[in-house]
Amino acid sequence: MHRTYSLRNSRAPTASQLQNPPPPPSTTKGRFFGKGGLAYSFRRSAAGAFGPELSRKLSQLVKIEKNVLRSMELTANERRDAAKQLSIWGLENDDDVSDITDKLGVLIYEVSELDDQFIDRYDQYRLTLKSIRDIEGSVQPSRDRKDKITDKIAYLKYKDPQSPKIEVLEQELVRAEAESLVAEAQLSNITRSKLRAAFNYQFDSIIEHSEKIALIAGYGKALLELLDDSPVTPGETRPAYDGYEASKQIIIDAESALNEWTLDSAQVKPTLSFKQDYEDFEPEEGEEEEEEDGQGRWSEDEQEDGQIEEPEQEEEGAVEEHEQVGHQQSESLPQQTTA
């Protein structure tokens, strides 16, 4: 992994950040207990302190992801309360502000519903990682047994090289190594298949969640277009608000767009830089085929002129003469080549 894009190094600013510099960090970040609460820190440290040695790191990751789910659930609940409060606040304002804030509250409430759905799908990713952890935990005993037998053999060879137990332990070591090989192969296969399945769950859910939120944001901006923000002078009256039907239709369209969205209709597609290199490599095979076709066409043209078939027949005859005559082949070959 390139260091510029590694977790161990800070990233270069993006084009969006260069165009619009990001705001300063929020004042509420880590205000009381740093980056996580006391319960979060305890769960994280406890997950890596117990269980088989092989599965401790993944156990810690699974526990951290559980904390992520709890944080997202808290965010969804808070967003739902914020949507309700926005609608309550707008109720006491003018007709246009009241209607727009009510509809915006509906959209923000829908975002919280999408957060709940995302949590359910994200949990499938965590459970799949958890299955890898369980497999790692089952492989650890076979490793420990093999290491224990190896240590016993080394101890006996040092203390009593003639001990009859050494041969018995060596046979047990062969069986333990065979069992360990089978377990390691299963772990290798399951790790790869489960890892792909887990992150497919996560990335598919991220794509769906982000694109649906982008849809909601687009319809929210359409609602804002109905709000007249032109300044008025003191004593001037604003025109009567007539956007009730339009705002209602925007909500209906948003609901329809969310219901009809599928993963196949995702708008954002990745652009891979190495794909072009692969495409550049492909025509080389086509060029070889074209060269072969060109040679075939050239041979056909030559055969029409009678310039290829006769020398081949003469060469075959020369080979036969070489097998039969031997010494006369040296005389016949120059004649055939000149012919």
Curated annotation (Swiss-Prot):
Print the keywords alphabetically. Isopeptide bond, Lipid droplet, Phosphoprotein, Ubl conjugation
Chain intervals with Polar residues compositional bias: 1-19, 326-339
Task: Report the record's Gene Ontology biological process terms.
Answer: eisosome assembly; endocytosis; protein localization; protein localization to eisosome filament
Spans annotated as Disordered: 1-31, 273-339
Q: Which residues carry this modification: Phosphothreonine?
A: T14, T233
Location of cross-link Glycyl lysine isopeptide (Lys-Gly) (interchain with G-Cter in ubiquitin): K29
Q: Which residues form the signal peptide?
A: none
Phosphoserine modification sites are: S16, S45, S98, S163, S230, S299
Acidic residues bias locations: 279-293, 301-318
From the Swiss-Prot or TrEMBL record, state where the protein is found.
Answer: Lipid droplet
**Which Pfam families does UniProt cross-reference here?**
Pil1
Q: Any one cellular component term from GO for this entry?
A: eisosome filament
Modification(s) after translation = Phosphorylated by PKH1 and PKH2. Phosphorylation is inhibited by sphingolipid long chain bases (LCBs).
Q: Which residues form a coiled coil?
A: none
List, in alphabetical order, the Gene Ontology terms for molecular function in this entry: lipid binding
Q: What does this protein do?
A: Negative regulator of cell wall integrity (CWI) in unstressed cells, probably by inhibiting protein kinase PKH1/PHK2 activity and regulating their downstream CWI pathways PKC1-MAP kinase pathway and protein kinase YPK1 pathway. Activity may be regulated by the transient increase of sphingolipid long chain bases (LCBs) during heat stress.
Q: Write down the PANTHER family for this protein, in alphabetical order.
A: SPHINGOLIPID LONG CHAIN BASE-RESPONSIVE PROTEIN PIL1
Give the free-text miscellaneous remark of the entry.
Answer: Present with 2157 molecules/cell in log phase SD medium.
Protein name per the record: Sphingolipid long chain base-responsive protein PIL1
Provide the species name: Saccharomyces cerevisiae (strain ATCC 204508 / S288c)
Q: By which gene is this protein encoded?
A: PIL1
